[in-house]
Regions:
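Outer-membrane beta-barrel pore domains and translocons
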Residues: 1-2, 113, 124-126
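Conserved small-residue
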Residues: 1-98, 138-141, 149-177
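Short Gly/aromatic-enriched secondary-structure transition segments
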Residues: 10-11, 124-127, 132-139
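Residues that define the transmembrane beta-barrel architecture of outer-membrane proteins
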Residues: 102-106, 178
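Domain-core and long-helix interface of multi-subunit machines
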Residues: 106, 147-148
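Outer-membrane beta-barrel architecture
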Residues: 109-111
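Repeated loop/turn-to-beta-strand initiation elements of outer-membrane beta-barrel proteins
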Residues: 116-120
Length: 178
């Protein structure tokens, strides 16, 4: 059976979004965020390094470079990626990108007995759950750490079809977005 819960009544007239903020019509465990479109490419920039018209930049992100993540722009503002008013009525460019509620729980139990020896096993799991990774699994290179082999497929000028965005020093640039 599908484990989902929806809030049918809650006093939040402003429809604010956020962690532990509830609203009518919300499915428990909603994950709001930006939807990846692609990486910025060198073609998105003018010769002086500024973005060409119509290429959006995340609000407050500072300067972006080729290889940074470009998010989809869903609202009428074509120059900025932003969180709107932070409400369900005006989420800006954020969308529901997942749900952290474990769904489709299952379990299997088996046992066998032979000449006084008993063996039993119990397996259980979840068939669907989205996970918002914000720890060392997501950011394994914190501090002076080294890269895992799996993370070496990052964007460079010679590897523009990479899986991961460009790497850069931990100087606080784009930390809210990339």
């Amino acid at each position: 059976y599908d484990s989902q819960s929806e809030i049918t009544k809650y006093n939040n007239e402003t429809n604010l979004l956020g962690d532990k903020i509830y609203r009518k019509g919300m499915k428990m465990g909603e994950i709001w965020g930006y939807v990846t479109d692609r990486f910025y490419t060198e073609d998105d920039f003018n010769a002086d390094g500024t973005l060409k018209p119509g290429i959006p930049i995340p609000k407050g992100a500072g300067k972006v470079f080729p290889g940074d993540v470009l998010y989809k722009n869903f609202d009428d503002d074509t120059e900025t990626i932003w969180s709107g008013e932070g409400t369900a009525d005006n989420p800006g460019d954020q969308r529901i990108i997942g749900n952290s509620t474990p769904r489709f729980h299952y379990g299997i139990t088996a046992g066998i007995s032979w000449k006084g020896l008993d063996l039993s096993i119990f397996l259980r799991g979840v068939g669907k759950r989205d996970y918002w990774r914000t720890d060392q699994i997501a950011w394994p290179t914190g501090g002076w750490g080294s890269l895992f082999k799996e993370t070496l497929n990052f964007w460079t000028p010679t590897n523009t079809n990479a899986y991961y965005p460009r790497v850069y020093s931990n100087d606080g640039v784009n930390t809210s977005y990339n």
